């Protein structure tokens, strides 16, 4: 009986912790934006950009392409103590013809917040730093209902004349909730849709300036709870500066491929002949082409 009550208490605590974390995820970025906004006119180190573009959201296993339009706001600020702060808020409007999720509202959101600082500089090119990332995603056509990733970490950074590289490792909180419509048709019920864990992440990236105006970057990142992988992500970006049109503007091609480990949602052994994953697909790809303009 004591063991049962203890398990119930732990479950209740995790539920309350998740509720407070989701509220924090909403309120913390708002506070950051307000803080940056109050300094925008007083500090030249604050920069605002906005983007406008088109996208294709691909679910390859269903041969699904969802096209649409998107835009975002980018805020970057460097404090007096050389701490770099950034906030990126994305909104996507889909032309949803495939209806992978029959009740999908054709609008979804993505956000990224970061605080970055330097711990030690070994040379003009090589440094050790720290970084705190908060990332979120809501209501994708691939049935991601809510996602939150909060990861402080350490970084090793190389900044050459034409090449850049970074290795990042961190530990933090990972949460992914699947939209309920498709899972219900596969035998899953309320309470089966969310997965939250203390987790670890490792990321590596490399960038090359092909010309003074044309730059490319490749990155790979994984999240793991210590026993199994949670998510893998691969990113590619290519930018072309268009200062001739407006100083600080650029064309940006961005590709993000994400793989999800759905075994964490299994109600029975994944080796059972009757096992059905919570979704009939386990990856998605965002292809985005945008014009970035200073505000």
Residue ranges and their predicted role:
Residues 1-49, 294-295:
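Cleavable N-terminal export/targeting peptides
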Residues 48, 80-87, 120-128, 161-169, ...:
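Repeated loop/turn-to-beta-strand initiation elements of outer-membrane beta-barrel proteins
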Residues 55-61, 90-101, 120-122, 133-145, ...:
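Sequence/structural signature of outer-membrane beta-barrel proteins
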Residues 162-207:
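Hydrophobic, aromatic-enriched interface-forming segments
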């Amino acid at each position: 009986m004591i063991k049962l009550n203890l398990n119930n208490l732990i479950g209740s605590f995790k539920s309350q912790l998740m509720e407070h974390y989701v509220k924090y995820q909403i309120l913390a970025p708002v506070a950051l934006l307000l803080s940056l906004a109050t300094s925008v006119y007083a500090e030249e180190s604050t920069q605002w950009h906005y983007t406008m573009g088109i996208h294709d959201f691909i679910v390859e296993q269903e041969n699904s392409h969802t096209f649409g339009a998107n835009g975002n706001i980018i805020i970057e600020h460097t404090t007096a103590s050389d701490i770099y702060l950034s906030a990126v808020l994305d909104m996507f409007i889909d032309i949803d013809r495939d209806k992978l999720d029959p009740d999908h509202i054709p609008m979804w959101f993505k956000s990224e917040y970061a605080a970055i600082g330097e711990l030690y500089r070994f040379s003009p090119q090589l440094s050790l730093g720290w970084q705190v990332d908060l990332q979120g995603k809501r209501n994708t056509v691939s049935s991601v209902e809510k996602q939150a990733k909060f990861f402080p970490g350490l970084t090793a950074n190389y900044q050459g004349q034409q090449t850049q590289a970074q290795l990042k490792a961190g530990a933090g909180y990972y949460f992914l909730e699947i939209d309920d419509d498709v899972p219900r048709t596969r035998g899953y019920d309320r309470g089966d849709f969310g997965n939250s864990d203390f987790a670890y992440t490792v990321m590596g990236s490399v960038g090359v300036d092909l010309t003074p105006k044309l730059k490319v970057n490749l990155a790979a990142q994984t999240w793991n709870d210590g026993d199994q992988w949670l998510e893998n992500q691969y990113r590619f970006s290519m930018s072309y500066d268009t200062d001739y049109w407006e100083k600080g503007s650029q064309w940006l091609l961005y590709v993000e491929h994400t793989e999800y480990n759905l075994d964490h949602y299994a109600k029975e052994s994944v080796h059972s002949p009757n096992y059905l994953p919570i979704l009939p697909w386990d990856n998605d790809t965002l292809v985005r082409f945008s014009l970035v303009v200073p505000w």
